[in-house]
Amino acid sequence: MKGWGWLALLLGALLGTAWARRSQDLHCGACRALVDELEWEIAQVDPKKTIQMGSFRINPDGSQSVVEVPYARSEAHLTELLEEICDRMKEYGEQIDPSTHRKNYVRVVGRNGESSELDLQGIRIDSDISGTLKFACESIVEEYEDELIEFFSREADNVKDKLCSKRTDLCDHALHISHDEL
């Protein structure tokens, strides 16, 4: 009878490890997809477009302390994007990396009517995947909203790895993931 107890314990540990890895793959993939979507949206804004930031109070000398900042990376624009960006997760599918056997999430729909030349072989596309990816994305936005705004308010290189791996620890295997854009 003792053997069954050890077997149950071992089975529980293995299932727990598998679930944790699946959960990490999901959150890592959601973070990386979120970064891709935000970078694309920011790039679509006219770089000449600005927004006034600062105090709209009139100083005693009659002047105002207002500063013009680029709209694309303004806190107002980023906050607006974060409110709706996770809806884009329905445009992603799940792919198992043959070498690592880990799940990756890849865009399966072109942006703004672009035709997709993507080979969809080996990519699972269904409402369960997009629903769980959207939920993971919303959780990330809720938990890391300040970090997302901080990172995207100024241009930076390698945002995916810096944000998803180093800052949030959502990805432990970021250097091994290829995450191609359409």
Swiss-Prot record:
<keyword id="KW-0256">Endoplasmic reticulum</keyword>
<dbReference type="Pfam" id="PF11938">
    <property type="entry name" value="DUF3456"/>
</dbReference>
<comment type="function">
    <text>Positive regulator of neurite outgrowth by stabilizing myosin regulatory light chain (MRLC). It prevents MIR-mediated MRLC ubiquitination and its subsequent proteasomal degradation.</text>
</comment>
<feature type="domain" description="Saposin B-type">
    <location>
        <begin position="24"/>
        <end position="175"/>
    </location>
</feature>
<dbReference type="InterPro" id="IPR008139">
    <property type="entry name" value="SaposinB_dom"/>
</dbReference>
<feature type="disulfide bond">
    <location>
        <begin position="86"/>
        <end position="137"/>
    </location>
</feature>
<feature type="modified residue" description="Phosphoserine">
    <location>
        <position position="115"/>
    </location>
</feature>
<keyword id="KW-0732">Signal</keyword>
<dbReference type="GO" id="GO:0010988">
    <property type="term" value="P:regulation of low-density lipoprotein particle clearance"/>
</dbReference>
<keyword id="KW-0597">Phosphoprotein</keyword>
<keyword id="KW-1015">Disulfide bond</keyword>
<feature type="signal peptide">
    <location>
        <begin position="1"/>
        <end position="20"/>
    </location>
</feature>
<comment type="similarity">
    <text>Belongs to the canopy family.</text>
</comment>
<comment type="subunit">
    <text>Interacts with MYLIP/MIR.</text>
</comment>
<dbReference type="GO" id="GO:0010629">
    <property type="term" value="P:negative regulation of gene expression"/>
</dbReference>
<dbReference type="InterPro" id="IPR021852">
    <property type="entry name" value="DUF3456"/>
</dbReference>
<feature type="disulfide bond">
    <location>
        <begin position="31"/>
        <end position="164"/>
    </location>
</feature>
<protein>
    <recommendedName>
        <fullName>Protein canopy homolog 2</fullName>
    </recommendedName>
</protein>
<dbReference type="InterPro" id="IPR042415">
    <property type="entry name" value="CNPY"/>
</dbReference>
<feature type="short sequence motif" description="Prevents secretion from ER">
    <location>
        <begin position="179"/>
        <end position="182"/>
    </location>
</feature>
<dbReference type="GO" id="GO:0005783">
    <property type="term" value="C:endoplasmic reticulum"/>
</dbReference>
<feature type="disulfide bond">
    <location>
        <begin position="28"/>
        <end position="171"/>
    </location>
</feature>
